Amino acid sequence: MNPDAVFERNYALVEPHTLLMKAQVRSIFDRLLEVRQLPGDCIEFGGFRGGLSFFLGLCIRDLGLAKRVTMLDSFQGMPQTDAAIDGPFRRGMMASDLQAVLGLRAALGLEALVEVRAGWFDDSLGQMPPAAQFCLAHLDADVYGSTKTALRYLLPRLVPGGAVVLDDCLFHGATGVILAAEEVLGRDLHLHLGPKTQAFLFPKGDPRHDRPAPVWRSLGGRRYDLADLMARAEYIELLAWEEAFYREHAQWYRDYLQLVSGRPDPSEDSYRITNHIGRIRRR
């Protein structure tokens, strides 16, 4: 089956069960295509409702790959967090229903391809097969402690050329994910920026012979490679939409402050803008 058709078909099946935007899922799918010839399985830390893990399982099946997926989640939400580095993330956030996830797995016919391990990472990882190895990992743990636990387990088991995708790597007000990555993998990371707050890297070497030439930009004292982000038209379109959205948000907020502070009346356009604030469009 054509890879684009595989993506569209399977994204449509899992879209109601993931908080990831379509562009973010596409980026992870591209990583799967890049590492599909490597040995090792796929693993997701922080599977939530199962959408991304099941998407990977569906794609593995359609592409005829000899791989499986392991999904780990506490199903109790986040563990204790550190507000100084984890920002808005708090204990208990992002809890999900284990039975609903298992039901979705059965409905999709993925029992043989996707293993769901319920529990805190420390407990679940201690029960993993000793010979486990991985070519693709999606870390959606959101916070410092969980991300560091996941990376410490993953690094010795990641095959050469394997890809690691970090969600919420650039989440506003939260630096826990990137700090954990730097502590485990080293400060001099080649971070490829993905859609939204996503970044990915190849800790043991980039296997892509046709990878684009780096396009470096700095943010917050760290360097990010934008080449992959700028290579796809849908990513550029998403960036343009986000820029317009946040410009409108900023204008509305300025008008709001004028309103409550008794300054000159806000623009008429701000009332229209308020109807759009908070709507997140999936692309």
Locate each region found by the language model.
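S-adenosylmethionine/decaboxylated-SAM
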Residues: 1-22, 29, 36-282
